[in-house]
Every structure is written in structure tokens, then in C-alpha cells.
């Protein structure tokens, strides 16, 4: 993924550049004025979607995931750094090199690797084990030629239920109990200490860490920026995701993207997608199923909050991937959790939806 060294282009700058170009053209002037440069947002398929955790059925191999991504029309894949997909101990250098070539032969790219780390534990041995895991994930990322490793401050985890499907609530309860009574400032300090070491190791391997705006330690995108500033490493940047933003109003999303600016090197989108009739609009159900609550739909999203978010990404000159992930408790039909056909349908429609959103964002910027 290309790294951006130029300052973020604000909407005001973009409009000003476009106005100058139009004025010169109208005057018939001979001076060549460069057109405003937009970023490029490319859809990728995040392997957690086919990990065999959330649906009833087996996980795809990464080779099968690659084939699906190619067939559906995605431009890259992101690899979750845990079994059965990307656990670093399963991926020595030779295997990484072989898979890297296979991906290149398809014309796709490995958009990144996703670590599942928790640097927040009050138990030193646990933090050190997490740091060792991230070290190995950094090595694997470099061997795969991916260059970007998504990281958390804290990831409580998830588990597969005996009847099939995944849940977050048990892991979250364990995390809550482990951190009970510990000052937030201390938790923050532990996370920062680990990230300082991880960023140094990433730099040694030519890898950049992308800190995601994911709870529980991170509460707003301002926390992400604060941590990046405090670590102070060129090898730690940002993965800002719209679906988990604390506020999804258009102006707030635009400001967040603008504030992050050139630090943004990765993003994701998610959720469920459906189409009621052939050729009809793609609908996005509002799903409430995390933390052990039964799966329930609460209507449909009326506004596309991804549109202002992606428009802002394009304005800032972001050139990178936005990965699709389906990673929540899924519906039960006829007494069974839905299977891989449900996942396939969502992955196809999600790609169509995000392509349309990217195209509309571009139209609004150049019109």
C-alpha cells in the first residue's frame, strides 16, 4: 500500500483548486492548472468473514478465500492473524513466499494482516505473550509483502458456540472482570509501552502498524490520534473505520477523516446486505446481536453514512483499501445458524454497495 507524505487535502482546498482550474479554462488561458487529485479507495475481502466462526460450516482456506475474492470482484484480501487462516506459527517464510506469489498471479493484493492482540492486561506475562505474538505477525506480514498490520490496544476476543456461530459476550465478561478496579490511566500506559516496542519491531521489518478505532480502551477516534502521538513512531499509523465510530453524523465523520489525514492507511466496512427484488436497491439491516443478545433486526439504515466518510477519504488523498468484514452473531433459520450461502450473498452485495458508494462519492466531488 502506498504511503502518503503530502498534507491532507481539505474540502476547502479541493474546491479552491477546482475553481481555479475552471476559471483558467473559462478564460481560455494557456496556463496549465493541475486538476485536484482524488484518492483511490479499493475494496478488499477480510478473511474473518470466512473464518468458520460466525456461520454454520467450515472455514475456507486462504486459497479458497482468494478464489472467492477474485470471482466476486474484490481487489485484495486481508488476512486475520489467527487459525485457521493466518496464525504466524503456521506461516514460515517459504509458505508466505508461495502464497504471496499465488496472490500476485491472480492480480489481487494482500491489503494487510490483522493482529488480534490485547496489550491491556494487568498481568505482565499476558502482555509479553501478546507482544511476542505481534512480533511474529510482523514477520509474517513482511514475508507476505503486505506491509500493513492492523493492531488493537485491546481485543477481548470471541468464541464459537457448540451449536455453531460466534459470540463476543463471554470474552467481554472475562475482559471486564480482569480490568475491574484498574485505573484507565494505567491501562493506557501498558498499551503504550507495548505499542512502542511493537512499532520499533515493525520498522525493523518494513511494516507499518495501523491502530484501529476499536473499543474497549479506545472510546473515540481522538484516543487513536492521542496514542499515535504519544508513541511517536513513523511505523504507527491509523485504521479508521466508519461502522464503529462513536458518532456517524456526516459532519463528524468528515472531521474525523480530516483530523486523521495522512495517517490513515487502512479502513473497513461491514454489516449485512440484502436485496428484496431483482435489480432492486441494496438494503442494510440494522442488526443488534453482540455481547450475547439474541439476533434481532431493528429496521434498515435510512442514510448511507459511508458516503460522507468515503468522500472525505477521497478528498484527503487516501490511496488504500477498505475491507469487508462480516463478524457478528448471525441469524438462526429453522433452528440453525445460517451457513456459508448467507455469507456469500452478503459478500457479493457488500461489494456492489461499496462500489456504488465510492462511485457516488467521486461524482459529488467532480460535479
At which residue positions do the language-model features occur?
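Acidic/histidine-rich catalytic cores of soluble enzymes
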Residues: 76-77, 113, 184-188, 192-304
